[in-house]
Regions:
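Basic nucleic-acid-binding interfaces
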Residues: 1-152
Length: 152
């Protein structure tokens, strides 16, 4: 994957971050219409700020994104903006969620962030394949499906 340097009026930059954040209480609510709405909302909010979503994937209980954030913004301010504004927009579109979450806070506090250097292709591949990895992991670790009366 070619390394793309971005430009501002007096700056050349390449600031990419792998970010993971979750709904409040890590509830598995990101599916169907809510999933497509969250994707659309995050794309729109990033476009407003000039942030590029290089890769992104919405899991039922968390969101993975690879973002190119201009150096004029801190990661903390971008995440506050994305999580705050998207919460309001999600509750506007899905008013029934207020009973599950209350206080118009859809996202949990905090997030995971790591910088992406020259291993951008590896991180993008990880984000793309995260869902299939989680499904395989769940199949291996689901104890409820085992017969409790079977001798070992």
């Amino acid at each position: 994957m070619a390394q793309k340097a971005y430009s501002l009026s007096h700056t050349k930059w390449m600031c990419k971050y792998h970010i993971v954040f979750t709904p409040k209480y890590r509830r598995k609510v990101i599916y169907n219409q809510i999933r497509s709405d969250i994707g659309e909302i995050l794309r729109k909010l990033c476009e407003y700020k000039g942030i590029e979503i290089i890769e992104g994937h919405l899991m039922p209980d968390h969101v993975h994104v690879l973002l190119a954030i201009p150096p004029k913004y801190s990661v903390a301010s971008v995440m506050g903006y994305l999580k705050g504004k998207s919460s309001l927009m999600i509750f506007d579109r899905h008013a029934n969620l207020k009973y599950k979450f209350g206080n118009r806070k859809f996202w949990a506090e905090g997030y995971y962030v790591s910088t992406v250097g020259l291993n951008e292709a590896t991180i993008a591949k990880y984000i793309r394949e995260q869902e299939s990895h989680d499904i395989a992991l769940n199949k291996l670790s689901v104890k409820e499906c085992e017969d409790p009366f079977k001798r070992r």
